[in-house]
Regions:
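Active-site neighborhood of divalent metal-dependent phosphoester bond hydrolases
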Residues: 16, 33-103, 107-108, 133-143
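Short, solvent-exposed loop/turn segments at secondary-structure junctions
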Residues: 28, 53-54, 116-120, 163-165, ...
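Conserved beta-sheet core of the metallophosphoesterase superfamily
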Residues: 134-192
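Short, well-ordered beta-strand micro-motif
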Residues: 102, 112-114, 188-192
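A short secondary-structure junction signal
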Residues: 114-115, 121-127, 169-170
Length: 192
């Protein structure tokens, strides 16, 4: 959260005129989980569902948080009851949040998802495997091995999830998760 606000200030981000779209995993990465979740209440911040938000929702639904906790969700039990209630309410909003966001400018179409768009051709509203949208590393791993293919239907796809040393582009896919939690390197892609 603090790192994000510092970087946004350096980028001259204006909450009055700009919009920040997150590729998910807004939790389980540092100590300011609730503060980051509170950004969901601002008009300038939106997010797709990431696999960490999905793990939290699954923990709430099944009453078994072990998988989430070992993947960073332990913070949830370390906050006050009042803060836990607020975090729960904010996390539950991810039931209604999109897994995929499309942004169209006057000249380009961008698609934002957490891990992948699991098809070779994008179409708005097309049914795709949500587990792959949240978890798949196959396309990026294939690209790293030289098996690079564009996804039709949009100009640019922006993904997080799999950590890369620096913002990495293969065909029309951009990977921006530069492990800010450990490296302090928080990456952005400016659409307009």
């Amino acid at each position: 959260y603090s790192l994000l606000l510092t970087r946004l200030a350096k980028l001259n981000f204006s909450p009055d005129t700009d919009l920040l779209i997150s590729t998910g995993d807004n939790i389980d990465r540092g100590k300011e989980n609730l503060e980051t979740l509170r950004l969901l209440n601002t008009p300038w911040f939106i997010s797709v569902v990431g696999n960490h938000e999905a793990m939290a929702l699954d923990a709430f639904e099944t009453q078994d948080g072990n998988f989430w906790y070992v993947n960073g969700g332990y913070w949830y039990d370390s906050v006050t009851e009042k803060d836990r209630q607020e975090a729960t309410e904010l996390l539950l909003t991810f039931k209604q949040r999109p897994h995929i966001i499309e942004v169209e400018t006057s000249s380009k179409k961008y698609v934002i998802a957490h891990a992948d768009y699991p098809d070779d051709s994008y179409d708005y509203g097309k049914q795709v495997d949500i587990d792959s949208v949240l978890w798949s590393r196959d396309r990026l791993l294939g690209s790293l091995q030289g098996n690079i293919h564009p996804i039709r239907g949009a100009d640019t796809f922006i993904f997080g999830h799999m950590i890369v040393d620096y913002t990495t582009t293969f065909a029309n896919q951009i990977y921006i998760d530069t492990d800010s939690f450990c490296s302090g390197n928080l990456s952005f892609f400016k659409i307009k």
